[in-house]
Amino acid sequence: MRGNDASRLPLRGVRALELAEIWAGPFCGSLLGDLGAEVIKVESIQRVARGAVNPGPGAAGYAGGEPGERPWNRFANFNALSRNKLGVTLDLTSPQGVRVFAELANLSDVVFTNYAFGVMESFGLGYEALKRIKPDLVVVFMPGYGNTGPYKRYRSMGMTIDAITGHSALRGYPDLDLSSLTMVHHPDAVGGITAVVAVCTALYQRARTGRGAFIDISQAEAFMPHMGEIFLEHSMTGQDSERRGNRHPSMSPHGCYPCLGEDRWVTIAVRTDEEWQALREVTGMAADSRFSTAESRLAHEDELDALVAAWTSSLDRHEATRKLQARGIPAAPVLDCGPDTYDDPHLQERGYFEEVTHPDAGTHVLSGPIWRLAGVEGPVQRPAPCLGEHNRHVLRDILGMPESAMSRLEEQDIIGTVPLQGSDMGGVRRVARQGRARTKTRARASSPQPPRRG
């Protein structure tokens, strides 16, 4: 731990069961793991949410575009969001799988899920059932729209939450329609962090009162405070906010400006008249009555942006940033999510990125913890689990299950390490369409078991 004591992480000794997929729920689990919790990710071989089970060569999301022999263990999004977790498989549609989960829940502190409303109840594992198993459990259900209300049964993804919260209508440039949205959906990340805060608060309450908690999180509602000023503006004026692109309602200049090189940019935000004066001095811009006040700068943004762009276009993006920051003007280069960020000297010096070796995916650089606790910072302790990798560790060492019982569960496909045919999301249709259907026997014969780690 770079000389730090992992035992001092604040959630050391807390066990959390994760039933989650895609981004929001798994992000919550990875953050809890970063804080020291023992996170056990519960999956199944009947329905695998790790990308496609049988992707073709060149499929996105795999290192080098190569899915490999066990693609379910190589999917980048899953591996990035599943660090510091143990992985087990349980068929929760079977009574045996539910019984095993109940035993685990009885020895755990937290159960959290971002499954759609009603899924946990369909397993017989709704909150009331979990509360009967262990009254002081902290339980988090975080579907897209919460656990009450007319939308509670609606299915959701990041894009739909982005849309229903009003965020989609605010993003982008005024001259582009709403179909021009990006594929970066902030609600997922916000939902994950919100769940972590809720879990930590509930654990604190439990330590004081001995009581567990049921936490109902609507990912949409967790995200809506990010547009608080927009809602306030509407309540005061009755008018809808317009899409502004990179511009700001009270700051100018405020935007993204071209620099030397192909597709190189710098962002600049001028908040005050003092910063405006500093910008004039840095750029050598002549005094102009059109820009003398914040109001006049906003009234002449097109002309002002052209002057700023004329200055930035002669400079490297990092040089422009240094010149502006030296005068206290908020500025930053636009970096790509690749070599630019990996090689960024600031992130390198802080040790943000960490090299992690995964038995099936190989060695890759992952983002590190998003917070640092003095003296107890926790880097990645283990890579993402292979499918069912810790079945025996969890069932034998935590639950005390004998080998004969675990073998029976394997024979009945309650647990396993290889997906059943058609087990990915939409997998039956995908396999049939691509003509690469494999039987369970063939898949097991051709796919060696992933190595177990202690």
What does each of the following model-derived ranges do?
Residues 253-331:
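Aromatic-enriched alpha-helical interface/lid elements that frame and gate functional surfaces
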Residues 179-190, 214, 244-245, 252-254, ...:
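A short glycine-threonine-serine/GTX helix/turn-capping micro-motif
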Residues 325-381, 429-433:
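A glycine-rich dinucleotide-binding beta-alpha-beta segment and adjacent secondary-structure elements
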Residues 69-70, 78, 241-249, 256, ...:
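Short Gly/Pro-enriched turn/cap motifs at secondary-structure boundaries
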Residues 147, 176-185, 207-223, 243-247, ...:
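Conserved Rossmann-fold dehydrogenase catalytic segment
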Residues 1-208, 386, 392-454:
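N-terminal helix-loop segment corresponding to the beta1-alpha1 unit
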Residues 46, 145-146, 219-224, 261, ...:
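Glycine-rich beta-alpha junction loops
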Residues 192-213, 225, 229-237, 280-286:
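Oxidoreductase and adenylate-handling cofactor-binding alpha/beta cores
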